[in-house]
C-alpha cells in the first residue's frame, strides 16, 4: 500500500510518523511518499491533504498543475483524507467566519459546507475530547488549530464525530475530512480508519 502526502506546507512529518504507527498497528507493509506534482499521484492508493493555509495550498496546487488532477482522481474514487486546511480544500462550499464567501481554489469533491476560522482568533488552538464510537474507537483527545467547522452535510456525506453539536469528522464514500489535526493526537485511530478506507 502506497500513501501520498501533499507536501507544500503543513505537518507532512507528523502525518508521516502517525501513518507509520498506523501501518505497524495494522500490520500493513506500507510506503509513504511526498506529493508535489502530478506525476507523484501515479501509483498511490490513497492521499492525505494536511493542514496549513488552505488558500496557499490551493494556489500552489493550481500553479503546479496538480489541483485538477487531484480532483479527477478523488471523484474517480481515490481515497483521500483532508485535515483542517485539507478538509477546506475538499468542501464544495467554503466561507470565512469574518469575511464570508471565499473564492479560493478548491478540489470541491465533498458535499459539505465549511466555515474557516470558526472558533475565532482568540481560540488559536485548543484540545478537546471527542467520541469516535462511530468509527469503532473510543474517546480521543484531539488538537484544533485555527480550526474550521463543518456546518452542513448533504447527499452521502455523513458526520462521524461532533464537538458541541458541530461536525469535526465527516465521511463521504472515499473521502474523509477532519477539522482537527489527527497527526498531533496521541491516538492513531483516524489514520487507521483512513487505511481501512484505502483497503476497501
From Swiss-Prot:
Pathway: Cofactor biosynthesis; pyridoxal 5'-phosphate biosynthesis. InterPro entries: Class_I_gatase-like (IPR029062), PdxT/SNO (IPR002161), PdxT/SNO_CS (IPR021196). It comes from the Archaea. One of its GO terms (cellular component) is cytosol. Transmembrane segments: none annotated. Keywords: Glutamine amidotransferase, Hydrolase, Lyase, Pyridoxal phosphate. It catalyses: aldehydo-D-ribose 5-phosphate + D-glyceraldehyde 3-phosphate + L-glutamine = pyridoxal 5'-phosphate + L-glutamate + phosphate + 3 H2O + H(+); L-glutamine + H2O = L-glutamate + NH4(+). Pfam families: SNO. The active site is at 84 (nucleophile), 181 (charge relay system), 183 (charge relay system). The keyword RNA-binding does not apply. Gene3D superfamilies: 3.40.50.880. L-glutamine binds at residues 52-54, 116, 145-146. Signal peptide: none annotated. One of its GO terms (biological process) is glutamine catabolic process. One of its GO terms (molecular function) is pyridoxal 5'-phosphate synthase (glutamine hydrolysing) activity. Its EC number is 4.3.3.6, 3.5.1.2. In the presence of PdxS, forms a dodecamer of heterodimers. Only shows activity in the heterodimer. HAMAP family: PdxT. Belongs to the glutaminase PdxT/SNO family. This is Pyridoxal 5'-phosphate synthase subunit PdxT. It comes from Saccharolobus islandicus (strain M.16.4 / Kamchatka #3).
